From Swiss-Prot:
CDD domains: fer2 (cd00207). Belongs to the 2Fe2S plant-type ferredoxin family. The lineage of its organism: Eukaryota, Rhodophyta, Bangiophyceae, Cyanidiales, Cyanidiaceae. Ferredoxins are iron-sulfur proteins that transfer electrons in a wide variety of metabolic reactions. Its cofactor is [2Fe-2S] cluster. Residues 2-94 form the 2Fe-2S ferredoxin-type domain. It holds the Pfam family Fer2. This is Ferredoxin. GO terms for molecular function: 2 iron, 2 sulfur cluster binding; electron transfer activity; metal ion binding. It is found in: Plastid, Chloroplast. Keywords: 2Fe-2S, Chloroplast, Electron transport, Iron, Iron-sulfur, Metal-binding, Plastid, Transport.
Length: 97
């Protein structure tokens, strides 16, 4: 079980959730009452984008982000499994472009 801190000062988000390594971060957040943006839930759009501040994830199921965006730390929370404790900035769709 990993601890995932979700933060976004502008949106008033600062909460830590528990997420097993076999559950998508978005699903775990919803189960624990955290309302995050999403649309397709399939890794094919950018609505749920977050930025990994600390930690690591497996998001091999995503098909939207390009290599540069991934190297800059962007993740899609709807298809990202945690592989360590993480700090993630939420609501990052606009920052992608």
């Amino acid at each position: 079980m990993y601890k995932i801190q979700l933060v976004n000062q502008k949106e008033g988000v600062d909460v830590t959730i528990n997420c097993p390594g076999d559950q998508y971060i978005l699903d775990a957040a919803e189960e624990q009452g955290v309302d995050l943006p999403y649309s397709c839930r399939a890794g094919a759009c950018s609505t749920c984008a977050g930025k990994l501040v600390k930690g690591s994830v497996d998001q091999s199921d995503q098909s939207f982000l390009d290599e540069e965006q991934i190297n800059n730390g962007f993740i899609l929370t709807c298809v990202a499994y945690p592989t360590s404790d993480c700090v993630i900035q939420t609501h990052q769709e606009e920052a992608l472009y």
